[in-house]
């Protein structure tokens, strides 16, 4: 029997909800068994309540129905619990007990204990579906506004200008989608100044043309929104969103934010949200479009043209970097650029920066060095120096260079021109101490005559006067325009010449006043002077350095008796030529002394030779230069110098007889020609 009861119950549970039904206790109308617990789940269609009534009730009576009972539950809550015997109070009705619930589900539970002293027949009950007024029968109304009941259900409706949400219960206001595009206007909450609707979300947008920002102006008294709760949360709120900026949420009585809001954007979204509770009068504000301003600086270290108090959309300025700063784009640098105030309030080309000019590493100079500056940016300082003691700065004050605004290293005197280290002239590394004449004089070191040049063919001498110029006698080079020369060696033995520097002539310049004649018949040595430009500069050092040129003042006119130095590898009283350098001191002599000497050729007297003011007579008996010394320097001390310094007063030219007096070309008379020739031919010749 229990199996049959269970199957019938499962079949009843799985059945569709019915409008009515019967419930009987086990074995009804016979006595119900002991130790029974049975339940019935009643369900009627949605939209209906349940009316449950008993027509027979005969259950063991106990206090609080503790032994046997029939219990009625709805939604987990007990609606009633019955036991004992009951009869109808109305003679015209068989109903002894009834229950009515507004829900469509109900549970009936019958329980009996282990023994009954009497025979109890249980209960008979019936249920029917009854209409429920959902609008009034519940504590909370299911609709936010209007509730409409019908048999088996209800529906919600809304006032005019409201719409029903998707949940079909709550009403809201259709306040989204409005777009304001005028440059000035007013926006208000729905129904303002009457209470705004509940359960609403209003989305408005102000969209102005590019280049204008939306400026919101609010009065405090025009704002009244449900205030924040104890946790600071706004149940109803107003929010402004412009780009990635958010202003708000705002709520309360009186606007709590700034009364003027500059959004920096031409688009402003307005979001107003409300819940179902308290409603206030809402809000209103005015707005206007203001040209979007750009900041008053595009980049640092610059100035602007034109200068204005405020820059707005479409304004164009020229940005010029301050002195010492530049704009670097790739590998190209410039000092100015143009920038336009854009619609987003930002300057075009705002990524360009005026950076300090970088002059780069200072260029090296020949025969000198430059300090490595700490950095090479604008304002940095570096210093040049020359290789001492053989070179010095050609221009005093040209040592210090500063990184200038144009990106060049600049000196106050030379500008961007690099300093020049020129050879120190006239100072031998070892002073000459001998007193002997060269004709049979003493062996000396090249360090005492570092300007001495050896001409290999014809065997002769010359004087180094600059790193690329040799001064010699015209008769030395008139027959050989490509002479082979050496400097820096005391010995002219072929194997020893390698210790010095070989010089290559690039071009020979003979004085235009020199008359070319057969050497054996020559009687006129006037203007016996020539210049040789070297192909490559000579490196100076202790054995190689130039001799100074004479000045143009009268101090450089040698007086009779003044001593000078001569050097060379020419003939001596015992040898036709020597291989080791010899040097001597000899005095300046009156010119008539040279004219009185008889020559080695008895057929030609000295009276037939030409004597001019371009010649110096020097030497004496046993004190003279000779064959092989031609072109060498007759060196004298520079006047008024504390440190001994030598200049080339004369060049070995000719003499009637070796070992007596000799004739020297007076170099002072040719200074203009020398300097002019050197200046005009400073650049390498082009073949």
Curated annotation (Swiss-Prot):
Residues 438-679 form the Peptidase S1 domain. InterPro entries: CUB_dom, EGF-like_Ca-bd_dom, EGF-like_dom, EGF-type_Asp/Asn_hydroxyl_site, EGF_Ca-bd_CS, Pept_S1A_C1r/C1S/mannan-bd, Peptidase_S1_PA, Peptidase_S1_PA_chymotrypsin. It catalyses: Cleavage of Arg-|-Ala bond in complement component C4 to form C4a and C4b, and Lys(or Arg)-|-Lys bond in complement component C2 to form C2a and C2b: the 'classical' pathway C3 convertase. Ca(2+) binds at residues 60, 68, 113, 131-132, 134, 149-150, 153. The iron and 2-oxoglutarate dependent 3-hydroxylation of aspartate and asparagine is (R) stereospecific within EGF domains. Its EC number is 3.4.21.42. Inhibited by SERPING1. This is Complement C1s subcomponent. The lineage of its organism: Eukaryota, Metazoa, Chordata, Craniata, Vertebrata.
